[in-house]
Amino acid sequence: KIRVISENDNGIYDAINKGIKYATGDLIFILHSDDYFYANNILNEIVSLFKIKNPEVVYGNLLYVNKNYLPLRFWKSSMYERDLFFKGWSPPHPTFVTKKSNYKKYGAYISGFGNSADVELMYRFLQINKLSSIYLDKTFVCMKYGGISNKNLLSVLRQNIILLKIFKIHLNIFKIIKFFFFKLINRVKQFVDAKKLNSKKTNNYYR
């Protein structure tokens, strides 16, 4: 059953919070506009993992595609370890699946953080509240590159400055350098990894 809600909101994360509020299921998987599932069985695999292992969070890999649906950037994530956020790490937000009850316990997205609201929420859930998580090494979602969070370098820089303040490391020059160093290395690797993928278009997958 699909329920469509159309009304005024105060930005993307305010709209997402409304969706979470109206959702009736136990798990929340946020599929953004223009994104699509990489394969038609991925939801079944995620649900099975929740049933068998009962984690609070499951996340996976994300594939950015260009306008022709060809691989452009492959975000292969990794198992979460404490303090990884301080090295510029985070799960790919479009793959972040958690129980609806966690939004009630620990709060939803804070719109005031702008485009950094997604990382702040994942940081709050994983680092601060120590929710159990499982990294499923599968590609969950294909995402068109060039969305609001990847608009330009200035936008990306602003996001990262906000994150440094959220992580409370913005006054420590050593931690700032470490944050950007690891983030840059990881970003370059994502583009290199995408080159290794099959050049086959991905728009034939489940949407």
Language model features by range: what are they?
Residues 138-139, 151-174:
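Catalytic core of nucleotide-sugar-dependent glycosyltransferases
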Residues 17, 44-47, 157, 161, ...:
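Generic alpha-helical structural signal
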Residues 119, 124, 146, 157, ...:
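Short, surface-exposed, charged/polar-biased interaction segments
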Residues 1-152, 195, 199:
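Nucleotide-sugar donor-binding/catalytic module of glycosyltransferases
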Residues 164-207:
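Membrane-interface aromatic/basic loop that binds lipid-linked glycans or pyrophosphate carriers
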